[in-house]
Amino acid sequence: MARSGRDIAKVDAYEKLDMDYQDLCDPYMLEQDEELFYGFWGSCTNSYRDTKHHKGYQILLKWRDAFRVKANANGADGTRSRFQAAFDRLKECQALPAGVGVHSVTNDPFFVYTSNVDSHFKRDFDCKEVYELHGSVETWQCAGDVETGAREPCEKIWKLPLDFRFDLDVATMKAPGAEATTCPECGGKGRPNVLMFHDRQWIANRSEENGYIAWESVMELMLQEDPTLNLVVLEIGLNNRFLPIQSKGLEALEAIDRELANLGLKA
């Protein structure tokens, strides 16, 4: 999620209000104090956009490109045809999400599964090979009536303009709403399309989710059928707060291990 509790604790404006990270990263704050809500997310968004990539992103990008080169060395057409064949078999037995087509799923042997909401991975990596499972500050959604629940969000999702910046007062950490943060469909208040605390109205990105599910399913089938292939799960920057991410890696490894065991092989 956006920022850490440690960062928030150092902000004078929040300390004076006796507010912590969970108070601010809550959709109900939009109704309680609109400018404080937009100030918090505006600070995050401005900061994320100003932050340049560290070398870790370039290392991952080089690895991705190396995987592509290796796959192409073995015959790009052959790799695509194997992916297509596995995809078609899973589609035929209805083991893939409905509406997912093979061209909407990356056939690269590489995928980024992240809880980061800064959208930095999408600066360099193909959108089809990134799943931001908690959403992103670059994408906004209609907020509906958060306080009373009297009006559900209209399900409109939109991107912030690339040249947009929040007009943040750093003394109060407040920012006004703007046209860019207003729902273009119904004119209601907007909010980041980010999963927050106590969030019942977040609109999940089913397209990204389904793309990842389809990719993982195809890769698992290819690994099951070809024991010479290897699966690597690289976890970066995880701790006990990110159990959903850790469990996803374990699920993938356990699924492959079970299938190989059934074939009398060892992972």
Q: What kind of feature is each model-predicted range?
A:
Residues 1-267:
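Conserved catalytic alpha/beta core of Sir2/sirtuin-type deacylases, generalized to analogous enzyme cores
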